[in-house]
């Protein structure tokens, strides 16, 4: 690239896509770039360039050379129009889509649509219902799809080489799927969904994407492109995923010119240690703390949690402090300092905390760790630094932490009483790279129905309007996992009571901003109550960039609540909950999911049940209960009734005649105990078989719900 044009590109960090003059200037700039450089490369953006960017920590530390906008389209409730109008917090987030189109006799819902050059960088899909759909990608204004996915399951995306790291999960449907494979397009993209079953179900989805300046030469995704990238896709997947389990390794090669700064010290309450690094244009490539304590201070205990929360890490670059966070949160773990793994940080849950963000500086760097806990901490630090080429795009690493207690959460049915909580507001120029939400939930229900709303540079409507905390953090609600870019290090209880932690770090879906980034979360849940929230945000920015409203020592010194040992729910005595066990056998087409029921009156064992759907008459599901003595037991079943529920027959140990139950009701309600009779176990086991036998004429479906079973000795 000609030096003159390179300098022009690097010195134009503040594009305004809504300003005609600036758009015209950018168009001229890229026309010139095309003349002097793209004649050889043809495309500036390809799947290959984006995949390589995903593993370049150096590029992540810089403002984008190509000034794209980072945006999101989702299934959020379309009644949410403005904060000064009703329904700003409306929660029918699985109903939203752009429009319905008819094409060649098909009805297709438009989920995503963009014009001009861009690239989809992340897709998240989740549903309680059938995944029997077809997703179609239409590129560059064409009438025929350029790519099809034969399911509401991104594991079937159809590109060879995709593995964990670029696609999650990689083996089976867990009610949610996620893909990070970039899908670029030169002149627009539209994604539609065709339902292949008449079943009415909610579809939650998120599309993160980049919007490039007009005229940017982008190679559109196609079968030809897909056939070209398997080796690079596999290499990228491996680089992302295999790096998650690594902390400091003295045998590793961290690059030419790397230096390891190692120091050990002890800190009592109120003491701090300063670490000064080599001066000059360098960058920290790895920062690890190994905290060793008295043998009585064991990982997983409240005392250990307090210690890790009370060790405060601050980092100053070139005379300006840009990092302030508790050590547990700096590692992406949150309260308790549980194990966390991602592309950017690692914690073993036992005292080793490792940050792998690249942290450049021009002149000097000072790291300080302060102990505010009542416990002595023996700490070993390993810091790896390397030379860094500083240019006009280079940015400093920033981290900020805040905590607020007693925040009011309201049920989604009373959404008009909801409020937004400011997760973070960042001023200056920078690139938003990720965050951690760590909290204590005082309710016995899911608290995270609230959507994220991210506005960039004072835009009139959020460019990121989400569908709930679980979707933002790629969490399907019930299965904990940790991936290169998202994870759930902690969940104390199945109903989300107590401590919970979620992290998300951003790669191609990072968000550049020139003046301000404002991030709010709605405080919406399944039950009225309170939560204690703390947020840790990670971004790269100019030296003067900062987060407003950050917390300090006063919130650290407030301490932590003890880990709860019991959830405040209505437990049915000696009950075995169907959501806590797996069926031993079922019909192939019958599906099941755990479903929260706290929005409905009635008493379920743990305010949830196992909903079975997709079945037809004759389909069944079986459960086995073992470990019983050779004596008589009384068996009682608790179920759910609703307007779309069918008729079932209940068998114990496969007798000839079972007990029939009509599960239809005009409203969602919990049944009382259903007496199944008195039985002796066979070889110490009871086998319960539930068979679908039809439906009430008034019912609109054939679902059924199982709460729990009581097996009481006589």
Residue locations for each model-derived region?
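Short regulatory "switch" loops immediately downstream of catalytic or recognition motifs
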Residues: 1, 290-297, 690-694
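Beta-strand-centric surfaces of beta-sandwich/beta-rich domains
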Residues: 40-566
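A short, hydrophobic secondary-structure junction motif
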Residues: 3-5, 314-324, 709-714
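Extracytoplasmic
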Residues: 451-456, 466, 557-714
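Bacterial Sec-dependent N-terminal signal peptides
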Residues: 1-40
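Generic recognition of cysteine residues
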Residues: 34-36, 189, 354, 365, ...
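Intrinsically disordered, low-complexity segments enriched in Ser/Pro/Gly/Ala and basic residues
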Residues: 10-11, 26, 30, 36, ...
